[in-house]
């Protein structure tokens, strides 16, 4: 990841920003980055890392943060440790990196160049760049628990999922289909923006039904039943089919009498 940024650093030079935001693309959450940016500027950090609290028993799959006594300076950064450090005062919790970073531009450039010259480096932000800046005392943490998003509720506040595995990707979709979803797509004060082709509304014909499900635009549920599923746009489900606990990608055609349970169906099949 560090090498990918370095290879494209000419784009950053062209814009010449004072700070650079680097956010991971395989996570699901709702956040106001400006609040993190304000803290970054106020603390004069070389890098600010957004972090979330997770049970210590689950933290070994992530980059773990150990804080100094001031509660904001990062004392040590451990990439996927066998024994994750506990938060002060919370022995069962660990702060993990969300994969969201704000760098001072000059600090980032210097760190990337030094890392590129190290033949033993894996050229990874979490494995190499963050430990380097932590050792220099330049790394601060931003606690995601303090982020306030308009329209959020106690149920969905602080939601974050890493969807880097198939199981996690599936589970994140299932989070959307309960009566009171823990990730709320219906927050009109802070909508999740997307880009869809121009399609008509979803259509239900021949007593087709969808229960506790999301059905995308242009999809047709014809004489079939869909339960606890996410149906993307431009999907057709033929009569007498039964879909349960399934994620269906765009452009899928499901024939009559088909039964699909607890699956992910790839696009255009």
For every predicted segment, state its role.
Residues 105-106, 110-269:
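Left-handed beta-helix
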Residues 1-176:
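Unchanged
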């Amino acid at each position: 990841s560090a090498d990918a940024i370095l290879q494209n650093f000419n784009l950053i030079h062209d814009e010449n920003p004072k700070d650079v935001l680097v956010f991971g693309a395989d996570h699901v959450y709702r956040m106001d980055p400006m609040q993190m940016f304000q803290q970054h500027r106020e603390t004069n950090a070389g890098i600010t890392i957004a972090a979330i609290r997770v049970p210590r028993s689950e933290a070994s799959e992530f980059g773990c943060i150990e804080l100094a006594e001031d509660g904001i300076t990062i004392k040590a950064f451990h990439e996927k440790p066998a024994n994750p450090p506990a938060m002060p005062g919370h022995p069962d919790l660990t702060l993990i990196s969300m994969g969201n970073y704000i760098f001072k531009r000059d600090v980032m450039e210097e760190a990337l160049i030094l890392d590129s010259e190290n033949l033993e480096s894996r050229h990874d932000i979490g494995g190499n760049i963050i430990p380097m800046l932590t050792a220099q005392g330049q790394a601060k943490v931003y606690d995601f628990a303090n982020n306030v998003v308009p329209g959020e509720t106690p149920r969905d506040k602080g939601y974050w999922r890493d969807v880097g595995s198939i199981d996690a990707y599936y589970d994140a979709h299932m989070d959307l289909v309960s009566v009171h979803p823990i990730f709320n797509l219906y927050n009109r004060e802070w909508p999740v923006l997307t880009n869809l082709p121009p399609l008509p509304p979803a259509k239900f014909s021949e007593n087709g039904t969808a229960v506790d499900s999301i059905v995308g635009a242009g999809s047709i549920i014809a004489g079939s039943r869909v339960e606890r599923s996410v149906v993307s746009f431009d999907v057709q489900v033929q009569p007498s089919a039964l879909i349960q606990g399934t994620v269906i990608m765009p452009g899928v055609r499901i024939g009559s009498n088909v039964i699909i349970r607890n699956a992910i169906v790839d696009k255009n099949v």
